[in-house]
UniProtKB/Swiss-Prot annotation:
This is Ankyrin repeat domain-containing protein 53. InterPro entries: ANKRD53, Ankyrin_rpt, Ankyrin_rpt-contain_sf. SUPFAM superfamilies: Ankyrin repeat. Keywords: ANK repeat, Cell cycle, Cell division, Coiled coil, Cytoplasm, Cytoskeleton, Mitosis, Phosphoprotein, Repeat. GO terms for cellular component: cytoplasm; spindle; spindle pole. SMART domains: ANK. Interacts with PSRC1; recruited by PSRC1 to the spindle during mitosis.
Length: 497
């Protein structure tokens, strides 16, 4: 027996409530009485505030359900409208959607806001409205650390990129800001081969030596993607930047040398004072011992002659001992020292050099030619090196290599010298220790001794013959020539006829 199928009418039973998250469009507001509305997740372009559960107490609250769903739909549409208006570039629609009394900036699930969508589509008018009227931060990052300046740089809309970059930089955008993978705006411009963007960023102060998480510089991406014009430009800029930085660091090193010279002078003065005090103390001790020994010796001789020793010792020791106790101090001596007199410079008379007359080019046979055509010797014939003019700090300064390849400076009294110019260790040693450098011409760095057994040799001449040259120089291959080639190959002589 066939069962009759049960059909539910829409008027009699309400539809089932779905627990799936709602989409952006308006949803059905009819719900089963007594059920709870599921919490909606954050929609793309929606706020990040938590939504409370809406409870329906009875079927009579249908009007409240309609109002709640309509309110939610209007909120979602408004959020989407703000982001979409910024992406499209409709300024009037954007002003209508953005709430000037907002407390939080509307962000989607990827961290994008209206200013990010406007920058991604190069909508300069929307950028001006959001930054100037609604005070959006210029360096607002996304979830991946991308700022509007990062999003502006792409291959699309190349004509609109430069005005947007120029405007963001004038509003104070960080030109060297990095994403989570370490990319700067200059890295992105180098990847896309945008020469105009690269020039604008470099002129605004972008770091051409910045490295990303993989250790690549902007010029490395130009080489990877075969952007030759951009690579040449960056190479020239990097060379000029390195030369400028080197000149600045060398100027710092020159100032440091002047300070080290003054510091060394004060150290030597104090060192000389200490040694002078020690020498005077040793001299007093030696003098007292010597006078005492002489006194005791004379006392013994007088005692043998009948003179009391104590009277002789009192007369002889009174004068030198009192004089030694009242010896002037080193400081007083230094104050009493006369100022050093600079010896007058000798005055030399300027000697006139008599040079021989030039060769007589005239063809007069009656005049005898000039044979004395010697010239004074200007080449130094000495074998000893010339004294270097720069001051050498080897006796006062200790230069060691740090972990970054630079130099660490310490004086002889173990004081650390800071700050130190950011120069290579070899350059610092060459400037601070000029006496350690060779005075002769340096040999090429590639000239080093090699083992003679590893030098490639020519092939020894033997019975083997090479047919390459013979076949190259020959115009025709006749029968005797082919027979000789066959003999060389098989080493069997042809039968004689």
């Amino acid at each position: 027996m066939r069962r009759p199928s049960r059909r539910r009418s829409k008027a009699s039973t309400p539809p089932r409530s779905h627990t799936t998250p709602r989409r952006t469009g308006p949803s059905d507001s009819r719900r089963r009485p007594g059920t709870k509305e599921q919490p909606r997740p954050s929609v793309q372009g929606g706020t990040r505030q938590a939504e409370h559960d809406l409870k329906v107490s009875s079927p009579n609250s249908e009007s409240s359900q309609y109002s709640t769903s309509e309110l939610w739909s209007h909120k979602v549409i408004a959020n989407y409208s703000e982001l979409f208006a910024a992406s499209v570039g409709n300024v009037d629609w954007l002003r209508f959607c953005v709430n000037p009394e907002r407390k939080e900036i509307i962000v989607d699930d990827k961290g994008f806001t209206a200013i990010h969508f406007a920058a991604q589509k190069c909508q300069l008018s929307c950028l001006k409205v959001l930054i100037e009227e609604y005070k959006y931060p210029v360096d607002l990052p996304t979830n991946k650390g991308q700022t509007p300046l990062h999003l502006v740089i792409h291959k699309n809309n190349k004509s609109d990129i430069l005005p947007c970059i120029d405007y963001l930089l004038k509003k104070g955008a960080a030109i060297n800001s990095q994403t989570y993978n370490g990319s700067t705006p200059l890295h992105l411009a180098s990847c896309n081969g945008l020469l105009g963007c690269i020039k604008l960023l470099v002129q605004s102060g972008a770091n051409v030596h910045a490295r990303d998480a993989t250790g690549f510089k902007p010029i490395d991406y130009c080489r990877l993607w075969n952007h030759r014009t951009c690579a040449r430009f960056l190479k020239d800029v990097m060379w000029k930047h390195d030369k400028k930085v080197l000149a600045q660091e060398m100027e710092k090193l020159r100032t440091l040398k002047e300070k080290l010279t003054i510091l060394e002078y004060h150290y030597l003065v104090e060192y000389q004072k200490e040694h002078q005090i020690l020498r005077e103390a040793h001299f007093r001790k030696w003098l007292q011992n010597k006078v005492l020994a002489q006194t005791l010796g004379s006392a013994d001789s007088k005692q043998k002659a009948g003179v009391q020793p104590w009277s002789l010792a009192s007369n002889t020791l009174r004068c030198p001992i009192t004089e030694s106790l009242h010896y002037p101090s080193v400081e007083a001596q230094l104050k009493n020292l006369p100022s050093p007199v600079v010896p007058p410079k000798p005055i030399y008379k300027q000697t006139t050099i008599s040079r021989p007359k030039l060769w007589n080019y005239s063809a007069n046979p009656a005049r005898s030619p000039i044979t004395n055509i010697g010239h004074p010797q200007n080449i130094r014939l000495g074998v000893h090196p010339e004294p270097y003019k720069e001051h050498d700090f080897r006796r006062f300064l200790e230069v060691t290599r740090n972990k970054h390849g630079g130099a660490c400076l310490r004086t002889v009294d173990r004081q650390l010298v800071t700050p130190v110019p950011q120069l290579p260790f070899e350059m610092m040693v060459r400037v601070l220790y000029p006496g350690t450098q060779p005075y002769r011409m340096k040999v090429p760095q590639g000239l080093y001794p090699r083992d003679i057994l590893k030098v490639p040799e020519k092939r020894h001449v033997g019975d083997t013959c090479s047919n390459t040259m013979a076949m190259t120089l020959r115009e025709t291959f006749d029968k005797p020539f082919l027979d000789s080639l066959e003999v060389c190959r098989t080493r069997v002589a042809p039968p004689s006829k």
